[in-house]
Amino acid sequence: MNIIESDTIANKAKIAIAVVRFNRFVNNNLLEGALDVLKRIGHVKDENITIIWVPGSYELPLIAKALAISHKYDGIIALGTVIRGFTIHFEFVAKECSSGLSRISMENTLPIGFGLLTTDNISQAIERSGIKANNKGSEAALAVLEMINILKIIKNSS
């Protein structure tokens, strides 16, 4: 039986982080969580991290596709917040963003960390972007680091 698993150190990895400007005060916390994990746990150097600010969550799949086809990055982290309103706009944006990022990841065999918060209210968004715990940006960064290493192991195994 073969078991493949990996750690989260990827000190030579090149990472792009796409961050949504809308709800920036929440997304700044997600970004800080992702950067903390990349540097402290993944040992990723500043010069290997690119941050791209986009207008809204709906734009995340497009920028992720552009980053993927550039072949400059080993992984992408998508960060944003969609808060439920009184229209179906929330469901539309969340679904399109989620399915778009998943499709791009699979089509390009490229890890994309899903750090898109979908919450009922601002309190939930603040809680899930916590500085000390429950930061979904941190979780997305950890997933990307591990998947970068797992994909390398699979590629290099015979």
Swiss-Prot record:
Protein name: 6,7-dimethyl-8-ribityllumazine synthase
Family: Belongs to the DMRL synthase family.
Disulfide cross-links: none
UniProt entry keywords in alphabetical sequence: Riboflavin biosynthesis, Transferase
GO molecular function (one): 6,7-dimethyl-8-ribityllumazine synthase activity
Role played: Catalyzes the formation of 6,7-dimethyl-8-ribityllumazine by condensation of 5-amino-6-(D-ribitylamino)uracil with 3,4-dihydroxy-2-butanone 4-phosphate. This is the penultimate step in the biosynthesis of riboflavin.
Pfam families membership: DMRL_synthase
Catalytic activity: (2S)-2-hydroxy-3-oxobutyl phosphate + 5-amino-6-(D-ribitylamino)uracil = 6,7-dimethyl-8-(1-D-ribityl)lumazine + phosphate + 2 H2O + H(+)
This protein's pathway: Cofactor biosynthesis; riboflavin biosynthesis; riboflavin from 2-hydroxy-3-oxobutyl phosphate and 5-amino-6-(D-ribitylamino)uracil: step 1/2
Residue ranges crossing the lipid bilayer per the database entry: none
Enzyme class: transferase
One Gene Ontology term, aspect cellular component: riboflavin synthase complex
Active site: H89
Assembly mode: Forms an icosahedral capsid composed of 60 subunits, arranged as a dodecamer of pentamers.
UniProt record, GO biological process: riboflavin biosynthetic process
Gene giving rise to this polypeptide: ribH
InterPro entries documented for this protein: LS, LS/RS, LS/RS_sf
HAMAP family assigned to the protein according to its UniProt record, in alphabetical order: Lumazine_synth (MF_00178)
EC numbers, comma separated: 2.5.1.78
UniProt binding sites for 5-amino-6-(D-ribitylamino)uracil: F22, S57, Y58, E59, T81, V82, I83, F114
Origin species: Blochmanniella pennsylvanica (strain BPEN)
SUPFAM superfamilies in alphabetical order: Lumazine synthase
Binding site for (2S)-2-hydroxy-3-oxobutyl phosphate: R128
